[in-house]
A protein has these predicted regions:
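Canonical Radical SAM [4Fe-4S] cluster-binding loop centered on the CxxxCxxC motif
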Residues: 3-36, 131
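Hydrophobic faces of well-ordered beta-strands that scaffold small-molecule active sites
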Residues: 8, 60, 94-96, 119, ...
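Non-cysteine beta-strand/loop elements that form the S-adenosyl-L-methionine
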Residues: 11, 108-126
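Conserved glycine-rich "GG(E/T)P / GGGxP" loop and the immediately following alpha-helix
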Residues: 25-28, 51-85, 99-109, 126-142, ...
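A short, N-terminal amphipathic alpha-helix
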Residues: 41-53
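A structural motif corresponding to the C-terminal end of an alpha-helix
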Residues: 85, 114, 149-158
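Active-site-proximal cofactor/substrate-binding loop regions of enzyme domains
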Residues: 119-120, 131, 136, 156
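Single conserved hydrophobic/aromatic residue that forms the stacking wall/gate
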Residues: 168-180
C-alpha cells in the first residue's frame, strides 16, 4: 500500500493594508492581535498534527493575507511547530506568500533556515500607476529588489503573481464600479 499524503495550508490573515481587489480574509492588525493569532495557530498545529500521523505532508502553503508581514521570529516558530507536529516528506514543497515591502534579507535567510523552499511574490502588475490603483504598497522597482533578495538567499523556486486583467485597461466608468 502506498503512503497516504496530504497538503497543509496555513492562513495568515494580516496585511499592511487591504488591497481593493482582495476577497480573501485579511486585515491590518496591531502586534498584540498578531501575537494572539500566532499563539492560537501554534496550539492548533500541535492539536491537529497527531490526528494526521498516518499522513505524509507533501506540501505546506503559507498564504494570506500577507504572511511575510509577520515577524521572522513568529514564522520560525510556526515552521518549527509544523515540523514537530507533522511528518513532512523529505522533498516537501514549503511555500510562503510575500509582498514587496514586507521582506528583508534577514527574513529570507530565516525562511530558508526554517525549511521554506518556495517563495510566491505578489507583484500583480509591472506598472506603478496600476499598482497604485490596485492599492498595492509597492512599486515595480521594490518588486525587483525583493525578487533579487529571494534569489540571493538561495530560493531557486520563486513564483510571481501577476493579474491578467487590471483596472487601468478598462474604461473609467467600469473602473469606478469595480472599485466601489
Amino acid at each position: 500500500m502506498s503512503q497516504k499524503t496530504m497538503e497543509l495550508y496555513i492562513h495568515i490573515p494580516f496585511c499592511v493594508k487591504k488591497c481593493q481587489y482582495c476577497d480573501f480574509l485579511s486585515f491590518a492588525a496591531d502586534e498584540a492581535t498578531q501575537a494572539a493569532y500566532v499563539e492560537a495557530l501554534l496550539r492548533e498545529i500541535a492539536y491537529y498534527g497527531p490526528h494526521c500521523s498516518d499522513y505524509l505532508v507533501s506540501t505546506v502553503y503559507i498564504g494570506g493575507g500577507t504572511p511575510s508581514w509577520l515577524t521572522e521570529e513568529w514564522m520560525a516558530q510556526i515552521m518549527s511547530a509544523v515540523r514537530r507536529s507533522f511528518r513532512l516528506a523529505s522533498d516537501a514543497e514549503i511555500s510562503i506568500e510575500c509582498n514587496p515591502g514586507t521582506v528583508t534579507d534577514h527574513k529570507f535567510a530565516v525562511y530558508r533556515n526554517a525549511g521554506i523552499n518556495r517563495i510566491s511574490i505578489g507583484l500583480q502588475s509591472a506598472v506603478d500607476e496600476e499598482l497604485k490603483i490596485l492599492g498595492r504598497i509597492h512599486t515595480f522597482d521594490q518588486f525587483l529588489k525583493t525578487y533579487e533578495l529571494a534569489r540571493k538567499n538561495g530560493f531557486d523556486n520563486v513564483n510571481v503573481d501577476i493579474m491578467s486583467l487590471s483596472l487601468i485597461h478598462i474604461s473609467e466608468p467600469t473602473r469606478r464600479v469595480v472599485i466601489s
